[in-house]
Amino acid sequence: MSSRSIVSGVLVVLLLAGSAWAHHNMSAYFDFNNRVTITGTLAKIDWRNPHIELIVDTKNGEKVQPFRLEGPAPGFFRDRDVSRADFDGALGKAVTAEASRARDGSDWGLLRTMMLPSGKLVSACPQNC
């Protein structure tokens, strides 16, 4: 194998590792010290890898304002006895969520907990939130 091939291979690995680290460094996108409580209607569930996404329609006066919540992968929830059916049962109903707000101040947050209409408290944190 030529030294050029080895150097090229090493560079590719280093570039991919940097991209993977940046993607999984949630503190780059979310301010863990800026917690918000969102109350509204669960409008959408995107249950897929690598992260689930929920849309909660909140009220801003008379205007409906969607708030996007990003959570861990579906497998994270399955390991904690939470299924998509738990979220499906909440579609169109009132929920309350706690999230770490996006650093850019947009209506986007990293899901910490969500209280479902069934009374089930769902935690999206690997340890205590």
What are the residue ranges of the model-derived segments?
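Bacterial N-terminal signal peptides
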Residues: 8-19
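Short boundary/loop segments of OB/S1/cold-shock single-stranded nucleic-acid-binding domains
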Residues: 20-36
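Conserved hydrophobic positions within beta-strands
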Residues: 40-42
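A short macromolecule-binding patch
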Residues: 61-73
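Short nucleic-acid-contacting surface segments enriched for D/E, G, S/T with interspersed K/R
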Residues: 79-97
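OB-fold/S1-family single-stranded nucleic acid-binding modules
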Residues: 100-127
